[in-house]
Amino acid sequence: MGELVKTIAKALVDNPDAVEVNEIHGHQSIIIELKVAPEDMGKVIGKQGRIAQAIRTLVKAAALKEKKRVIVEII
Amino acid sequence: MKELIRTGKTVEEAINLALKDFGVPRDMVEVEVLDEGGKGFLGLISKQAIVKVVLKDVIKESAKNFLKQVIDAMKLDITFEIEETEDTIKFNLQGKNVGLLIGRRGETLDALQYLVNVVASKYKGYERYRRIILDAGNYRKRREETLTRLARKLAKKVMETKESIELEPMTPNERRIIHLALQDHPYVETYSEGEEPNRRVIIALK
């Protein structure tokens, strides 16, 4: 799941090497923390959060397969 | 600037010079080595390496690479075919997991289509941009037919009851299908209300 967020983020930003993803596993849910270079924040959030929303939609679909709730946080 | 010829001490160095001039990663070009370079006769004179580096169709390549990476990361068993027109590049996704990638009312497919366009539009400066469309198992066509049928059925109901009907929230493209389906209708008209993502079509008597 973290791998998916990393793949998408790396393709969007100008500094792919600065992309960091951290997974926190709970009982029923996983929190994925996404960190990018400060100047790339807009690239993963988008106008009115549209890009962040699209990332969450895709992750939600992937999570369906593993029957877990996934929360993506951009920090 | 679709191809460059560069020289360097080694083939690798010459390729890297061209990549820097193009400003693209290695997988966006094809390389033809014109001269391997290296040491000449008896190692006395060293020859320069010469390469011809040709820029691929970067919009299509970046979209293709991104899609492949996402499908792999989601561990899905999905392949795709590409259909090109003058203004669009369409990827038809196939495989047993396509349902998962379509999602409820196509929301996952729309999200991926949006992202793939964001990624590919990084290369807008290189060639005329062509919009990327994702379809899966003919989903878009079937959805268009369903929405057209729904629009006609609801128009009939509006005429019978003489009351307007508000549809559920839809994407701009889906709203367009409803508007188009009823644009020549003699007795009803359509318009949209509300803000994205809750914008809805209203069907009303003229």
UniProtKB/Swiss-Prot annotation, chain A:
User: Pfam families from the xrefs?
Assistant: KH_KhpA-B
- BP terms from Gene Ontology: cell wall organization; peptidoglycan biosynthetic process; regulation of cell shape
From the Swiss-Prot or TrEMBL record, state where the protein is found. Cytoplasm
Q: What are the boundaries of the signal sequence?
A: none
Q: Which GO terms describe its cellular component?
A: cytoplasm
GO molecular function terms listed in the Swiss-Prot or TrEMBL record: RNA binding
Looking up SUPFAM superfamilies in the UniProt record yields: Prokaryotic type KH domain (KH-domain type II)
| Entry annotated with the keyword Hydrolase | no
Question: What's in the keyword line of the UniProt record?
Answer: Cell shape, Cell wall biogenesis/degradation, Chaperone, Cytoplasm, RNA-binding
KH domain span: 29-75
Summarize subunit and interaction data from the UniProt record for this chain: Forms a complex with KhpB.
Instruction: Please state which protein family the record places this protein in.
Output: Belongs to the KhpA RNA-binding protein family.
Function (record text): A probable RNA chaperone. Forms a complex with KhpB which binds to cellular RNA and controls its expression. Plays a role in peptidoglycan (PG) homeostasis and cell length regulation.
Protein's name in the database = RNA-binding protein KhpA
